[in-house]
Curated annotation (Swiss-Prot):
GO terms for molecular function: structural constituent of ribosome. The gene is rpmJ. Keywords: Ribonucleoprotein, Ribosomal protein. PANTHER family: RIBOSOMAL PROTEIN. This is Large ribosomal subunit protein bL36. It comes from the Bacteria. Belongs to the bacterial ribosomal protein bL36 family. GO terms for cellular component: ribonucleoprotein complex; ribosome. GO terms for biological process: translation. It holds the Pfam family Ribosomal_L36. HAMAP family: Ribosomal_bL36 (MF_00251). NCBIfam families: rpmJ_bact. It comes from Petrotoga mobilis (strain DSM 10674 / SJ95).
């Protein structure tokens, strides 16, 4: 998982989710695309 200042969708399977006041990118197809903002 990457922690970044700005998160972007890396593919069409990525979803942007808000959890606990943080923005996350979760990907069903490629788990390497997981990211968290902050």
């Amino acid at each position: 998982m990457k922690v970044r200042a700005s998160v972007k969708k890396r593919c069409e399977h990525c979803k942007i989710v808000k959890r606990g006041g943080k923005v996350w990118v979760v990907c069903s197809k490629n788990p390497k695309h997981k990211q968290r903002q902050g």
